[in-house]
Amino acid sequence: MNIEELRKLLKAGEWNDVEFKEARMEVPKSAFETISAFANTHGGRLVFGVAERGESYEITGVDHPDKMQNDFLSVLHADAKVNHDVQVTEQRMNLEGKIILIFQVAENHRMRKPVYLDGDIRRTFLRKGSGDYKAQMQDIERMLRDATADRWDSLPFEKVLLEEAFHPGSIRWYLDRFHQVNSGFDPKQPDQEFLYHWGYLLRDGRQYIPTNAAIMVFGSPLAVHQLIPRPTLDVQFLGYTADEPMPETRWIDRMICEDNIIQAWEQLLTKYRFFMPKPFRDIDPVTLGRRDDPPGFRVFREAAVNLLIHQDYGDHSRKAVIKFFRDGIQFWNPGDVFGDDSRLWEPGEKEVRNPSIAMAMRRIALCEQAGTGMRMMREEWQKLGHPEPFFRN
C-alpha cells in the first residue's frame, strides 16, 4: 500500500476489508477480534494509529511502533491466542510526521477455519460491514463442516431402512437419462449394483448403506425429510421488479419443494416452462420433438442445477430460493463459495462442497462440465441482450 491508497482508505472509512484502531500506547484487545473476523471472512487491513472522530478519522500515530509491532505479533503467534496460524503482512508508513502500522490479514483456507481466540470456539468472529461480530453457532458449524476432509455428501445415512430410502421414480428417471448419455453400460444392471458402482451405496458386511448424496439425489420423501428438516428449494414468481418495494401481494405463484434433487428439478422445470414464453424454433432431428425451450433456458438450467448441487445441505437454518422478478431472476444459495471465489471464472476443476452430487448431475449432462458453467452463463446471457449477471459471495 502507498500513501495515496491510505488517504483513500481514510476518506472512505471503515468497511468489510479495513479496520482502524487508535492504538497509540498499547495494542487494543479488540485488534485480535478483528484478526479472527478477517481470517474467517475475506481478509482485510488492520491499521494502527488512526482514531475515529465522529464520522471522520484522524491520524494520531503510534508512539513506539517497534514495540507495538513486536507486542502485537508475538501475542498473535503465541499458541494460546489463536487456534490456527494466520498470515499477516506488516507495513509501516510515515504520514504527516506520524507513524502508522498496517497489517494485511489474509483469509484462512477452509481447512483452517474457524479461527477463534483464547481456546474458546465461542470467541469466533466474522466481518460484517464495518464491524466484527461474534459468529452464531450455525456459522461455526458451517465452518467446521467445510473444514473436514470428509465431504458431507459422502457420509453414510442410516436413519431409515434401505428398502425405505429411495424413490423408485427418481432412480428410473436418472437411469433412463444416464443410458441415453453414456453408451457401453448395461441397462439391465440392478439398481443397487448401479448405485454401489458409482459410490452412492457403501457396503457394511453384507448390507448396503446409502450416502447423503444418494438420499439427496434419489431419496424417498421419508429419507429426505430425515436428512434435511427444511425445504430443498423455494421458488417464487413475483409481480414486481427487484428495485420496487414489496407489494401487499408478495407473489403470483410459489412452489416449495421438500423432495430430492431430481424431483425438485422436475417440479421447477414444469413451473418455469409454464411461466416463461416458449417460441417454437424447429424440430429436433433425433427425437423429432419440438424445440421450443424459452430463450436463455441453458443459462437458467445451469444456474438452477448449480443451486441444487452446491448448497450447504448441512445448514438447516436456511433454504435455497429462486425469485423470478419482472426484470430478472435471483438465485440465493445457503453457504459461501467452497473454494477460491476469485477463480470462479477460470477454466478447470474447482473444489466443490458436494462432489458426489455434482458428478451425478454431470454424468447425465444436466449441467456443464466442471470449470465451464460460470463463463457459459455470462456469455450466453449477454448474447441474448441482457446485462452481465451479477455474482456476490
Region spans (language model):
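Structured core elements
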Residues: E19, V47-G49, L101-Q104, I215-V217, ...
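Active-site helix-to-loop segments that bind/position phosphate- or nucleotide-bearing substrates
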Residues: R127-H316, F324-F325, I329, G335-E351, ...
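Amphipathic alpha-helical transducer elements in NTP-driven molecular machines
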Residues: K29-F32, D66-N70, F297, N354, ...
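Well-ordered beta-strand positions
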Residues: A39-N40, M93-N94, V217, K323, ...
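Polybasic/polar functional segments that serve as interface/processing modules
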Residues: M1-L46, V50-I102, H109-M111
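Short, hydrophobic/aliphatic alpha-helical segments
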Residues: M25, E349-R363
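Conserved NTP-handling cores and scaffolds of large molecular machines
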Residues: G13, A39-L46, L76-N83, H109, ...
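Intrinsically disordered, low-complexity regulatory tails
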Residues: N83-E163, D315-R318, I364, E368-G371, ...
